[in-house]
């Protein structure tokens, strides 16, 4: 079986993203950060540029969101946050590089549902331990998938789609950006909750899956909102639902899957992490800076324009969330039969 492909589209923008947000690098304020009367290791973090490893390729949704975050962190801290793309094996190559970096706070990167919650069950062997080899700092964003269907499919709503699938087991196919990606697991969750057979057709990324949806080779896909919503708004495909727990602010007219199938939720998420052993004082300072960045109106607006929700958490909250996600998704992955040896 081939490795899962990176769960990421080359992303058309919903609204212009300013050069300042993407490249920013002006000195900012340190207000709002905890201070103590005695210097501690890392108490002046960051006092040099910070390398941020994005585990997915350039040009996709995660790349744009990561660069927006790093630009805002550069602005707030006065130090450059430099994005380095290290993609491959569904994000595993990049997170392994994070895990093996020096734990001083100056190499951080993107944690994600793919390597940190899906890979531990999907892969027979990993070069890292998702629960032990990282210092998690904060959540970063949550980005639901969008269920879209070919215009020729006789289903204009989720209930109509469910009825069609149940009446025709094995007749229809869904495409995904690869084995073990959130589009794959979204389709598997639909299959299991509806109780019928739907053929899974994995592709090497989201773009070829969308092309085959447009041509009718597959009838439905569920992938990140940025890669699908513009095509749906052009009328070339039909959007039926989002897979997050709430309706998306970028498309509030589209219902959630859970409105029809209670408990249905698959949301891509990002987090900021460094290697295990990063000093607690560095984690605390980074977390405080991250809160300023992720609550800044400019960043909130830019994230939401891309269909993502900014998501600040404490380090303890993101650690607990990651563990719960791995436990929640493991039965779904096993039931799908997906396994990478």
Where are these regions (language model features)?
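Short loop/turn segments at beta->alpha junctions
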Residues: 18, 90, 157, 202-205, ...
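N-terminal (or domain-start) structured segment
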Residues: 37-133, 171, 196-220, 312, ...
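Conserved helix-loop-beta element of the AMP-binding
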Residues: 45, 135, 161, 234-248, ...
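An extracytoplasmic/periplasmic, membrane-proximal ligand-sensing/linker region
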Residues: 45-49, 233, 280-341
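Hinge/capping helix and adjacent helix->loop/strand transition within the periplasmic-binding protein
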Residues: 100-106, 113, 121-208, 257, ...
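A ligand-binding cleft/hinge motif common to bilobed small-molecule-binding domains
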Residues: 115-125, 191-193, 220-252
């Amino acid at each position: 079986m081939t490795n899962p492909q990176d769960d990421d589209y080359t992303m058309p923008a919903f609204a212009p993203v300013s050069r300042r947000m993407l490249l920013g690098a002006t000195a900012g304020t340190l207000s709002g950060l905890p201070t103590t009367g005695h210097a501690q290791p890392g108490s002046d973090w960051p006092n040099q540029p910070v390398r941020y490893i994005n585990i997915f390729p350039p040009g996709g949704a995660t790349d744009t969101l990561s660069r927006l975050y790093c630009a805002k962190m550069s602005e707030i801290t006065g130090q450059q946050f430099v994005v380095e793309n290290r993609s491959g094996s569904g994000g595993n190559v990049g997170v392994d590089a994070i895990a093996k970096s020096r734990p001083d706070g100056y190499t951080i990167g993107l944690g994600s549902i793919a390597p940190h919650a899906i890979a531990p069950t999907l892969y027979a062997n990993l070069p890292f331990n998702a629960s032990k080899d990282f210092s998690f700092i904060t959540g970063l964003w949550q980005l639901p998938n969008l269920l879209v269907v070919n215009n020729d499919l006789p289903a204009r709503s989720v209930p109509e789609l469910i009825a069609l699938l149940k009446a025709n087991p094995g007749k229809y196919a869904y495409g995904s950006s690869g084995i073990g990606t959130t589009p794959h697991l979204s389709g598997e969750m639909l299959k299991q909750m509806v109780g019928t057979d739907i053929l899974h057709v994995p592709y090497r990324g989201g773009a070829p899956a969308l092309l085959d949806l447009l041509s009718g080779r597959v009838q439905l896909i569920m992938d990140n909102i940025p890669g699908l919503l513009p095509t749906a708004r052009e009328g070339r495909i039909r959007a039926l639902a989002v897979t997050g727990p709430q309706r998306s602010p970028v498309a509030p007219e589209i219902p959630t899957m859970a409105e029809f199938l209670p408990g249905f939720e698959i949301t891509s998420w990002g987090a900021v992490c460094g290697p295990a052993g990063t000093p607690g004082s560095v984690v605390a300072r980074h977390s405080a800076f991250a809160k300023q960045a992720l609550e800044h109106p400019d960043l909130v607006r830019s994230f939401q324009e891309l269909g993502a929700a900014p998501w600040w958490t404490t380090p303890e909250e993101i650690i607990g969330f990651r563990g719960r996600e791995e436990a929640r998704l493991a039965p779904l992955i096993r039931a799908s039969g997906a396994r990478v040896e």
